[in-house]
């Protein structure tokens, strides 16, 4: 009898050990609460690994990182992943909640026909700021000048950070000059690069990892960051009852927008569980938690009734038609332009 019990325990342990889903996703996107809800439903374990930029994600995968089931790249990262033969085509028949996604987020240049990806949220790259300091200094956070104009930056020198991400920072500089965030024009790239070089001495750091905290505690006054991260910084400062308030806003020159999508790795150890997870995240109530908990924009129409009312008036979360017209989705630039941007970034970082 004891032998049978021991065998049962061993078999159960092995079964449970195999029922693991490996998630490779952005920092600060899906809350622990949502992950635990999925684990309870599927009676499985989710092991998550995080990254702070697409460059970091692609570098890890290029270096041979494996064993992931579901990944959550920005849309402009899908094309490189397909070219690297790292994704499997999706079986739409297994995704019964796919119908919930707003058609305007489907069938994009990044993935025509959504053969490989399903959008689950979006973020806007914009300015987050300390309301008290910005008001005191008479600065305008609705213009990219607060990040790129040396005359403006002189008032907040050492109190500004930008993402450590060439795709986002160069795109913002391009929009500042009225160019497309997806420009392939070498003259426009040079103008954006020169602007960043001129602004860099006034910045405290390139920071994609700790800028939420730095802004929320008052060490930094202005950041170029992601809308969902800045939602968290605003919430953290409020919860901590700081003597100042944090806010974030769109820029009048326009902003880059990135939709994040679920994909399944070509060598996924547990593809069945991957489909189950994606379908779970496409349910209206579960998708809404990404917005309610993390402040991300929501392409899922079934989620909107469950989004907290006060968030529906935040332009970076639910933009109106006029605001949407100034949001530009970032796309893959192709190898040649990508190299040019990376070379420009190296010049910027090395101070050449």
What is the role of each PLM region?
Residues 18-84:
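Early extracytoplasmic/lumenal segment of secretory-pathway proteins
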Residues 265-326:
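Mature extracytoplasmic/periplasmic domains
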Residues 100, 189-198, 204, 242-263:
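Periplasmic-binding protein-like
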Residues 78-204, 209-216:
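Extracytoplasmic ligand-binding site segments that recognize negatively charged/polar headgroups
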Residues 69-73, 204-205, 221-226:
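Paired acidic/hydrophobic, glycine-rich loop segments that form the ligand-binding mouth/hinge
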Residues 128-133, 175-178, 258-270, 289:
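A bilobed periplasmic-binding-protein/Venus flytrap-type ligand-binding module shared by bacterial periplasmic
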Residues 213, 321-352:
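Conserved C-terminal helix/tail region of periplasmic/extracytoplasmic solute-binding proteins
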Residues 77-80, 222-243:
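A ligand-binding cleft/hinge motif common to bilobed small-molecule-binding domains
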């Amino acid at each position: 009898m004891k032998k049978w019990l021991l065998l049962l325990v061993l078999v159960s342990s092995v079964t449970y050990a195999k029922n693991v889903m490996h998630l490779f996703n952005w920092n600060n996107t899906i809350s622990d609460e949502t992950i635990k809800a999925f684990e309870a439903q599927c009676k499985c374990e989710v092991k998550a690994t995080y990254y702070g930029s697409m460059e970091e994600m692609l570098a890890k995968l290029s270096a041979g990182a494996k064993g992931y089931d579901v990944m959550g790249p920005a849309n402009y990262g899908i094309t490189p992943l397909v070219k690297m033969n790292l994704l499997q085509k999706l079986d739409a028949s297994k995704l019964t909640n796919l119908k919930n996604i707003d058609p305007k987020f489907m069938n994009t240049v990044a993935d025509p026909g959504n053969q490989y990806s399903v959008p689950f949220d979006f973020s806007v790259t914009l300015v987050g700021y300390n309301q008290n300091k910005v008001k005191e200094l008479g600065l305008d956070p609705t213009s990219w000048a607060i990040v790129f104009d040396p005359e403006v930056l002189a008032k907040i020198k050492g109190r500004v950070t930008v993402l450590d991400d060439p795709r986002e920072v160069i795109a913002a500089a391009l929009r500042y000059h009225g160019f497309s965030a997806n420009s392939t024009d070498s003259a426009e790239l040079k103008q954006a690069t020169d602007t960043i070089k001129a602004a860099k001495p006034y910045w405290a750091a390139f920071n994609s990892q700790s800028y939420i905290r730095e802004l929320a505690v008052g060490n930094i006054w202005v950041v170029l960051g992601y809308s969902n991260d800045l939602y968290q910084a605003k919430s953290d400062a409020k919860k901590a009852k700081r003597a100042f308030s944090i806010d974030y806003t769109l820029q009048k020159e326009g902003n880059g927008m990135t939709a994040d999508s679920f994909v399944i790795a070509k060598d996924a150890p547990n593809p069945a569980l991957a489909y189950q997870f994606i379908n779970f995240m496409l349910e209206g109530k579960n998708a809404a938690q990404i917005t309610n908990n993390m402040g991300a924009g929501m392409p899922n129409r079934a989620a909107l009734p469950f989004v907290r009312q006060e968030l529906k008036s935040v332009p970076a979360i639910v933009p109106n038609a006029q605001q949407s017209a100034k949001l530009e989705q970032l796309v893959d630039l192709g190898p040649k332009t990508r190299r040019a941007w990376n070379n420009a970034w190296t010049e910027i970082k090395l101070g050449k």
